[in-house]
Curated annotation (Swiss-Prot):
Catalyzes the NADPH-dependent formation of L-aspartate-semialdehyde (L-ASA) by the reductive dephosphorylation of L-aspartyl-4-phosphate. It comes from Neisseria meningitidis serogroup B (strain ATCC BAA-335 / MC58). CDD domains: ASADH_C_bac_like, VcASADH1_like_N. The lineage of its organism: Bacteria, Pseudomonadati, Pseudomonadota, Betaproteobacteria, Neisseriales. This is Aspartate-semialdehyde dehydrogenase. Keywords: Amino-acid biosynthesis, Diaminopimelate biosynthesis, Lysine biosynthesis, Methionine biosynthesis, NADP, Oxidoreductase, Threonine biosynthesis. One of its GO terms (molecular function) is NADP binding. NADP(+) binds at residues 9-12, 37-38, 73, 165-166, 193, 351. Substrate binds at residues 162, 241, 268. The gene is asd.
Length: 371
């Protein structure tokens, strides 16, 4: 099997390569090839593969020699080569981090700890397009998959606290630049214990509203603020990110024909690479909290139920704790005042791992027959 990698140098691609190295995945790949859009003929990264030269990612004939293509190059790349590649007669596996093909009928959204049955059926039935899901959707399902898999959810609403990484590497840099720029405005005043906090606050507020604040990528301040809209405006009051929550969750679960209603608001906050979500669920039956926790904890190897206590919550349910790990903690689980079927939950997950690279890494192994 020849496996071609495109977009392996970008943020998601780099995380994917690191994870594949950690898990010794290249030992399961008979022949690996690396493609580029900008450095054709250059030296390929060395993961022990025979092919040492970078190939042209826009050359359909070269791509067509692959049995599997894994791309983290983005949606524009997918739109530019995918159909031409299929039209050339190529019948290989296309594994893609971008959203372009997610909702196509001949594509499966990959999240094997949650929908391995859907993946296995797809492989049996000749499906060749395996697409990574929206990061918040994947992270929500990793945390709450037990309830969805047992068909216990009547509806759910997710209010998100999404990290800068979801918008890209430049946006992560801009967040840090913003933090530093805010501090620089008031560094001297902060160093004076007798300084007025109201004066400091006014200087910060004035700076956030000024044209000097670095906001070329987000368009508005994030450090010291938040952004209550993510992705394009669908024109009906909903953002595309919010729309994805319902349609992608149901597609992942194989329930597009009989969907569970899921909606909410998506908000960008000043976290680096962990998305958090506050979720309200209406269950189909009134279950004890202890039973709900047992169902959640048993769903996969990465979800971690955090006791609904202050100390556990503030130490375990934060981006600072979770970033860079595969752990998906879920806590703040309790009955809400509206009735016994109404449950709250709060979950955190790394947007670049289970939110992006890890499902692709694992579906590659599944397609190769080694997971």
């Amino acid at each position: 099997m020849k496996v071609g990698f495109v977009g392996w140098r970008g943020m998601v691609g780099s995380v994917l390569m690191q994870r594949m190295k950690e898990e010794n995945d290249f030992a399961h790949i008979p022949e690996a090839f690396f493609f580029t859009t900008s450095n054709v003929g250059g030296a390929a990264p060395d993961f022990g593969q025979a092919a040492k030269t970078l190939l042209d990612a826009n050359n359909v004939a070269e791509l067509a020699k692959m049995d599997i293509i894994v791309t983290c190059q983005g949606g524009d790349y997918t739109k530019s080569v995918f159909q031409a590649l299929r039209d050339s007669g190529w019948n290989g596996y296309w594994i893609d981090a971008a959203s372009s093909l997610r909702m196509k009928d001949d594509a499966i959204i990959v999240l094997d700890p949650v929908n391995r049955d859907v993946l296995d059926n797809g492989l049996k039935n000749g499906v060749k397009n395996y697409i990574g899901g929206n990061c918040t959707v994947s992270l929500m399902l990793m945390a709450l998959g037990g309830l969805f898999q047992n068909d216990l959810v009547e509806w759910a609403t997710s209010m998100t606290y999404q990290a800068a990484s979801g918008a890209g590497a430049k946006n992560m840099r801009e967040l840090i630049s913003g933090m530093g720029a805010v501090h620089a405005q008031v560094a001297d005043a902060l160093a004076d214990p007798a300084g007025s906090i109201l004066d400091i606050d006014r200087k910060v507020s004035d700076f956030l509203r000024s044209e000097d604040y670095p906001k070329a990528n987000f368009g508005v301040p994030l450090a010291g603020s938040l952004i209550p809209w993510i992705d394009v405006d669908l024109g009906n009051g909903q953002s595309k990110e919010e729309w994805k929550g319902g349609v992608e969750t149901n597609k992942i679960l194989g329930r597009s024909d009989n969907p569970t209603v899921i909606d909410g608001l998506c908000v960008r906050v000043g976290a680096m690479r962990c998305h958090s979500q506050a979720i309200t669920l209406k269950l189909k039956k009134d279950l004890p909290v202890s039973e709900i926790e047992t169902i959640l904890a048993g769903a996969n190897d990465w979800v971690k139920v955090i006791p609904n206590e202050k100390e556990a919550s503030i130490h375990e349910l934060t981006p600072a704790k979770v970033t860079g790990t595969l752990s998906v903690p879920v806590g703040r689980i309790r009955k809400l005042g509206m009735g016994g079927e109404y449950i709250s939950a709060f979950t955190v997950g790394d947007q670049l791992l289970w939110g992006a690279a890890e499902p692709l890494r694992r579906v590659l192994r599944i397609v190769l027959g080694s997971l």
